[in-house]
Amino acid sequence: MSRVYNFSAGPAAIPEEVLFTVRDELLDWHGIGMSIAEVSHRGEEFIGVAEEAARDLRELLAVPESYHILFLQGGSRLQFDMVPMNLLANHKKAVYIDSGVWSNLAIREAKNYCDPHLATNAKELNYTGIPDQATWDMPNEAAYFYYVDNETVNGIEFPFIPDTDLTLVCDMSSNLLSRPFDVSRYGLIFACAQKNMGLAGLTIVIVHDDLLKRSPLPTTPSYLQYALHAKERSFINTPPTFAWYLAGLIFKWVKNQGGVAVLAERNQRKAAKLYKFIDKSNFFDNPINPTYRSRMNVIFRLADERLNSLFLKEATENGLANLKGHRLLGGMRASIYNAMTEEGVDALINFMGQFEKRHG
């Protein structure tokens, strides 16, 4: 069997060691004679899997005990609604940063519930960076301050945590577990699993206990209330058990790699070498301000975009899959999440160099 280097933005590459474990356990999990995908979500087997996954994630991210970790369904887009539904309380205003495609969608959704106040808008920079924080328009009062830590489509990543006294809410869908950060700075963090934590269909929410005391909007369905999910330990109904199990395996893998700090160093090396090659090239270009370049999603364009199809065809033939850019931006995108090896990035750089020699 020959596996390719998968640069998909999501669902994304899964560590091979994890896939081998899934293969070995799929028919008979730990000698029980059936798959973990077949057991009751309320049985002792899966309860053990779920609790261990939560403990491991808490340890990896140093999540204080004053936070609940929820394993929810619905993908990150559902959080665009759940956040205002649960956190607005008596406020009419929430603060947002428009840094790219995903924050823009969250802002549009928030308008159904409140007046989203833009602290700053990266559109004025053509989404190639974030305006200086000294220029942000920050109100003294608001329900929360929302931003996207890494914009997967635009290739922008925050190199800092915004300085604010407001309750900080962050979409970390594409870079959670990619570097250490201070969880205690945040009120709520959410991330879908299909980038760095496994399968689509699972979203992890880390929420401070104080926020669970806020009264949801009157029209909020019970299933969309964080407090109820926390009370029921994410077991209001049948959770996505296999995705939860796989996330737990990935948390074990991260621990075996040496933890989040070790992965952060590796991720920085991967991104740095790819950006270095692009910057030296006269054929490939990345428009993002270097300060805000994403370590997870490297976007680039060819000097002659008529060669895009040929580039993708030859890349696929060379075992480099899913490099096509997002439909809204075009061009190319190499998503190099935790599971992407340095060898995979080296193979991409080598191919790009050879392609430039032939067509540049």
UniProtKB/Swiss-Prot annotation:
Pyridoxal 5'-phosphate binds at W102, T152, D171, Q194, N237, T238. Its main location: cytoplasm. It comes from the Bacteria. GO terms for cellular component: cytoplasm. Pfam families: Aminotran_5 (PF00266). It catalyses: O-phospho-L-serine + 2-oxoglutarate = 3-phosphooxypyruvate + L-glutamate; 4-(phosphooxy)-L-threonine + 2-oxoglutarate = (R)-3-hydroxy-2-oxo-4-phosphooxybutanoate + L-glutamate. GO terms for molecular function: O-phospho-L-serine:2-oxoglutarate aminotransferase activity; pyridoxal phosphate binding. The modification N6-(pyridoxal phosphate)lysine is found at K195. Pathway: Amino-acid biosynthesis; L-serine biosynthesis; L-serine from 3-phospho-D-glycerate: step 2/3; Cofactor biosynthesis; pyridoxine 5'-phosphate biosynthesis; pyridoxine 5'-phosphate from D-erythrose 4-phosphate: step 3/5. L-glutamate binds at R42. Its EC number is 2.6.1.52. Binds 1 pyridoxal phosphate per subunit. It is an enzyme of class 2 (transferase). GO terms for biological process: L-serine biosynthetic process; pyridoxine biosynthetic process. It is found in: Cytoplasm. The keyword NAD does not apply. PANTHER family: PHOSPHOSERINE AMINOTRANSFERASE. Belongs to the class-V pyridoxal-phosphate-dependent aminotransferase family. SerC subfamily. This is Phosphoserine aminotransferase. The gene is serC.
